[in-house]
Amino acid sequence: MEKITVLLVEDEQTLAMIIKDTLEGQNFIIHTAADGEEGLRKFFDLRPDVLVADVMMPRMDGFEMVRRIRQTDKQTPVLFLTARSA
């Protein structure tokens, strides 16, 4: 079975490592970025199968990053993460 490539964009390093370690034990190849600007660059370089993004990050938040991605890529599934309570 072919591994699924995931781009994880998360500014909290500890959380990013927990998620990465959990998913790498499954059928995923995980690439990480620390903020929306880095995530945007890596997305277009890697063309991952799935994008997992934090909502609130420095330099560019997850919503803005996905808005820019959606200008040219409307197919890649996106999962948003947030630590904010409702």
Feature annotation, model-predicted:
Residues 57:
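Receiver (REC) domain active-site loop signature in two-component systems and cognate sites
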Residues 46-52:
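Active-site beta3 strand of CheY-like receiver
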Residues 10:
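Conserved acidic carboxylate
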Residues 17-25:
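Charged docking surfaces used in two-component/phosphorelay signaling
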Residues 35-38, 61-64:
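Acidic catalytic/metal-coordinating carboxylates
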Residues 54, 82:
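Active-site residues of response regulator receiver
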Residues 27-34, 42:
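Short hydrophobic/Thr-rich beta-strand motif most characteristic of the beta2 strand and flanking loop
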Residues 44-46, 68-75:
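Conserved phosphotransfer cores of two-component systems
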